[in-house]
Regions:
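Active-site neighborhoods of divalent-metal-dependent phosphate/nucleic-acid chemistry enzymes
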Residues: 6, 80-123
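Short amphipathic alpha-helical segments and helix-helix/interface helices
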Residues: 32-35, 72, 105-106
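Short acidic, glycine/proline-enriched helix-loop-strand junctions
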Residues: 66-89, 93-95, 125-147
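Short, well-structured N-terminal submotif of metal-dependent ribonuclease cores
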Residues: 1-47, 60-67, 127, 140-147
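Alpha-helix capping/helix-boundary segments
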Residues: 17, 51, 88, 105, ...
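A residue-level structural signature of the nucleotidyltransferase/glycosyltransferase Rossmann-like core
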Residues: 10, 44, 81, 117, ...
Length: 147
């Protein structure tokens, strides 16, 4: 029996997963693996410009400015950086999602027709979209690597 490989074409990665990677928080190994999948073009990895602004704000006291700029330049080369448009703000206002920032992230993912969302906070995404939502662990568990 052959295992079925689940590899969505386009995947949106939420800010909290990116911060796991940057701060090497618990679970960062999963975030690292997902970013590697994007860098080697196994998946088309998308993140929003809002995530990048949030990361600078959240990590401003713990990360060197040169290092974060180098990281962002690397991400720009390998990943799709989605703009936050007026429609994302309007969508977030109408969504009923209690987390405005996550509602804007979701709008970005939907406008890009992403096939999956990876976040550690599924409750701010799943009730508001038909896009499959995974934790990093769940997402990696869905991918069967052929050796």
């Amino acid at each position: 029996m052959t295992a079925t490989t689940y590899i969505p074409k386009s995947v949106f990665i939420d800010t909290n997963v990116l911060i796991d990677h940057l701060q090497m928080r618990s679970g960062h190994e999963n975030a690292d693996q997902i970013l590697a999948l994007g860098k080697n073009h196994t998946i088309r990895l998308c993140l929003s410009a809002l995530s990048m602004a949030d990361i600078v704000y959240i990590m401003r006291k713990t990360i060197d400015e040169k290092n974060i700029k180098n990281t962002f330049n690397d991400w720009i080369r390998h990943f799709i950086i989605l703009p936050v448009a007026e429609i994302s703000i309007s969508d977030a206002c109408r969504s009923g999602n209690p987390d405005f920032e996550d509602a804007m992230q979701l709008s970005c993912a939907e406008m890009e027709f992403c096939h999956a969302i990876i976040t550690r906070n599924k409750k701010h995404f799943e009730p508001y979209t038909d896009i499959p939502v995974f934790t990093p662990e769940e997402f990696l568990g869905k991918i069967v690597r052929n050796s």
